[in-house]
Swiss-Prot record:
Name the record gives this protein: Protein Smg homolog
Species, as recorded: Shewanella pealeana (strain ATCC 700345 / ANG-SQ1)
Family: Belongs to the Smg family.
Source organism superkingdom: Bacteria
Positions in coiled-coil regions: none
Pfam families per the UniProt record, alphabetical: DUF494 (PF04361)
InterPro entries referenced in this protein's UniProt entry, alphabetically: Smg
Record PANTHER family: PROTEIN SMG
Length: 157
C-alpha cells in the first residue's frame, strides 16, 4: 500500500501532473503499473480518509492544550521509531507541524499496513499530509526543503 501512495505522490502530485479524478481510471492505471487490486483499494481508502480528516474538524485532532506533550501509545511506539518521533517533535518546535497536523500524520502512519516505518517513510507521509492540508503551503515547502536538501557535511559555516 505504501508503494502505491509513493507512486501516486511522485507521479501525480509531486510532478504536478493532473491527478485522474475517476477512481476506476486511477485503479486501471495502478493495475497497469503492476499493483495488486487489494493494495490499490487500501491506498485509495487511505487517501479518502486523509481528505475526511482535513474536512471533519475531528475532535481528537483538536482537543489539546498547546503546552501539552505528546505521549505515544505502545502501538505507535512500535510503528514509529525513536528517531521518527524525535523528528516529529523537531518539526513541531520549528512550527512546520501544528499539533493537529502532527495528529493527522500519526493517524495516517498508523493506517499504513507495515509493521514499522523508517524516518524516510515518515517524511513522505508528512509531505502527503501537508500537501493535502489547505493553508499549510509554507509548511509543505519547508518540509520539501528538509527532504530534498542534501547536507554538505558541515555543521557550522
Amino acid at each position: 500500500m505504501f508503494d502505491i501512495l509513493m507512486y501516486l505522490f511522485e507521479n501525480y502530485v509531486h510532478s504536478e501532473v493532473e491527478l485522474l479524478v475517476d477512481e476506476d481510471e486511477l485503479t486501471k492505471e495502478l493495475t497497469r503499473a503492476g499493483f495488486h487490486q487489494s493494495e490499490i483499494i487500501k491506498a485509495l481508502s487511505w487517501l479518502e480518509r486523509l481528505a475526511d480528516l482535513q474536512e471533519a474538524g475531528t475532535p481528537y485532532l483538536c482537543n489539546h492544550d498547546q503546552q501539552s506533550f505528546r505521549i505515544y501509545t505502545k502501538a505507535e511506539m512500535e510503528k514509529i521509531d525513536v528517531e521518527s518521533r524525535g523528528f516529529l517533535l523537531f518539526l513541531e518546535q520549528i512550527k512546520v507541524l501544528s499539533v493537529e497536523i502532527r495528529e493527522m500524520v500519526i493517524d495516517r502512519v498508523m493506517e499504513i499496513d507495515e509493521p514499522t516505518l523508517n524516518l524516510d517513510d515518515i517524511k513522505w507521509v508528512i509531505l502527503m499530509v501537508l500537501f493535502n492540508a489547505p493553508g499549510h503551503e509554507s509548511a509543505y515547502e519547508q518540509m520539501e526543503d528538509l527532504i530534498f536538501e542534501q547536507p554538505d557535511g558541515r555543521l557550522h559555516s
